[in-house]
Amino acid sequence: MRLEAKTKLSSKAKEPINVVKYNRTGKYVLAAGNERVVRLWNVKSGACIHEYAGHGHEILDLDLVYDSTKFASCGGDKFIQVWDVNTGKVDRRLGGHLAQINTIRYNEDSSILASGSFDSKVRLWDCRSNSFSPIQVLADAKDSVSSIDIAEHLIVTGSTDGTLRTYDIRKGTLSSDYFSHPITSVKTSKSASFSLISSLNSSIHLLDQETGKILKSYIGLKNMEYRVRSSFNQSETIVFSGSEDGKVYLWDLENETQITSTSVVGTPIVTDISCHPTMDDFIIATVHGDLFIYQYN
């Protein structure tokens, strides 16, 4: 497999970008980081078409609603801000966490927003309500909640206490799977049957959500200190990850073999990665504020 660098987006950022995401159509990209601004790009033209400024501290995560008309962002100022994409205005500002908010995620129909914080709590927000209070607080983590994903009826959370917690909304149950190192990234499959878990021991594991068994492991990257996210491609056959050695790594999901890796020019750390929803493209963010789109074939 060959990786081809297609585009470098003019990010304007001089500081680390902590999160980058394609929207559901893949026509637009949102990214944010330590500069406290969310930027929106048109992928085809490569132009930055809007900037959303309003956070008082670094932005650590963001997520879009299903139809891409709104997005939520969070970070060091302990607030979630829900933005109208077209007007650039903040529709809602949600507080309650006692420390920085590391991660946020909408469910499939964007009716629920989950937020995870350094305060070890997960808060669930009803997006159909005008309430500024969470509908539920999940207080099971013993340390910072670093990552959340939602698929089908499962809310899956990773914590620096080394535990993956899976909340089954239908059954009202909690299952816990312990990893020996802090968890930094969680990505659950569309069917909610397995999850991709990154942790601070330079390894990524594929976990069976039903049994809690580790099905596959992916090694070769460097991840010992920072949050470095991993993901699947759109067909969930390839595992992608950034790395603290300035590279992007790809593995075959089934046989665990490393397909390829490539060094990203000008950066020591690749912080985040987002795969295009329909094409064989992915975008990466770096600690030096760069955004690169790659094609794999």
Swiss-Prot record:
Key words of the record: Cytoplasm, Nucleus, Repeat, WD repeat
WD repeats: 12-51, 54-93, 96-135, 140-177, 179-217, 222-261, 265-297
Cellular component, GO, one term: spliceosomal complex
Signal peptide feature range: none
Any one Gene Ontology BP term: mRNA cis splicing, via spliceosome
Pfam family membership, one: WD40
Record InterPro entries: G-protein_beta_WD-40_rep, WD40/YVTN_repeat-like_dom_sf, WD40_repeat_CS, WD40_repeat_dom_sf, WD40_rpt, WD_repeat_MORG1
Compartment annotation: Cytoplasm; Nucleus
Chief location category: cytoplasm
Alphabetized PANTHER family for the sequence: WD REPEAT DOMAIN-CONTAINING PROTEIN 83, WD40 REPEAT PROTEIN
Assigned protein family: Belongs to the WD repeat MORG1 family.
Protein name as it appears in the record: Uncharacterized WD repeat-containing protein C713.05
Naturally occurring in which organism (per UniProt): Schizosaccharomyces pombe (strain 972 / ATCC 24843) (Fission yeast)
